[in-house]
Curated annotation (Swiss-Prot):
Biological or metabolic pathway of the protein: Purine metabolism; AMP biosynthesis via de novo pathway; AMP from IMP: step 1/2
Subunit structure: Homodimer.
The name this protein goes by in its record: Adenylosuccinate synthetase
PROSITE patterns (alphabetical): ADENYLOSUCCIN_SYN_1, ADENYLOSUCCIN_SYN_2
Species lineage: Bacteria, Pseudomonadati, Thermodesulfobacteriota, Desulfovibrionia, Desulfovibrionales
Top-level taxon: Bacteria
Gene Ontology biological process terms from the UniProt entry: 'de novo' AMP biosynthetic process; IMP metabolic process
Species per Swiss-Prot/TrEMBL record: Maridesulfovibrio salexigens (strain ATCC 14822 / DSM 2638 / NCIMB 8403 / VKM B-1763)
Gene that produces this protein: purA
Amino acid sequence: MANTVIVGTQWGDEGKGKIVDMLAEQAGAIVRFQGGNNAGHTLVVEGEQCILHLIPSGVLHQGKKCLIGNGVVLDPEVFLKEIDGLAEKGVDVSPERLMISKKTQIIMPYHKLMDNCRESLKSADNKIGTTGRGIGPCYEDKMNRCGIRAADLADPELLREKIVAGLQEKNVLFEKLFNVEALDAEKVYQEMLPIAERVKPYLADVSSIIQDVNKEGKDVLFEGAQGVHLDIDHGTYPFVTSSNVVSGNAAAGAGCGPRQLERIIGICKAYTTRVGAGPFPTELFDETGDTLQKNGHEFGATTGRKRRCGWLDMVVLRETARLCDLTEFALTKLDVLSGLKEIEICVAYEYRGEKVDYPPQEQNGMAHVKPVYESMPGWDEDITKASSYDELPEAARNYIARIEELSGVKVGIVSVGPDRAQTIVR
């Protein structure tokens, strides 16, 4: 299979979990390299749904190592809740196969409080649409070099020291700026101790494990979260997440060299969705948008929020292909387009009187573009039982071919339904 990176090509929710679950069979290890539990990866195996927020999507494949890299921010309570839920289903979640990098940053209670306090102060027009799970404040502490790392959970005195230091500044903000009660450092520490005890067995040197897996002749699957256009640097800033989502961060966020990243698959929904605030050039506000939302079951796996829906945006995909050096696309939810008489594809933007093929670089530039559309005939056939590319309707194959022409990237995988088996590999 080769060491493979999975990235979302749009604004998240592209169906990465399903593709990771499918490819995990061929991998020796699956590693999450960025983000936190602000992402929800939904797996459906033989009709049974499983939603994961932190644990790699390959966990349902027994015997595969599942790793959480140093680029992730981990909420230990969510982690423990997930392993307990998986254990109830009979899934092996022992420390022998599930491991957390000792360098992973830990989301603390005060990060979540800070996240919600900040969002509450913003006007309706300035809200980012954060999930309120403490992701941003945790990354902020990491950059300020005062964060709590997973290894600190095994050192009670250092843990207490860091909690006390961390709350000195934050409590001033809570009381003076946000008008909420300050947190008691000792209470936070005492509440963390039993959690730390349960997490400690899972701590490991993830970087070395990745090297060992490759030395054994096995491949590693790098699982990204969110989407490239939520990337802190390359996304629709400031309506972005707090980490680098691009494929290049797989090396830094997992602890390996860039030459170990051999195959880069961009997961692409057959239309476009976005959760929360931020520019969305191809968003639909009509009956077609409602149809996509309904037929695609477009509700966030993490927040339950209704997703905004629109036509496929090739400007967005072209930019992702450039930023991530994609080797192929995995096209998901193609079945949702069945029944549409006509399908629109955004092939370019009009921006400041010019036609552009890539997103503008200026802040909020995407809010001022006009999509240039190309129409293609749709298809009526139910494609959910198609098991080969040739079984797809001609119009569906033409749609895929046009995506390849406009992006210069091959569509190597086509998903025609939520179940693992409803996947066509070309």
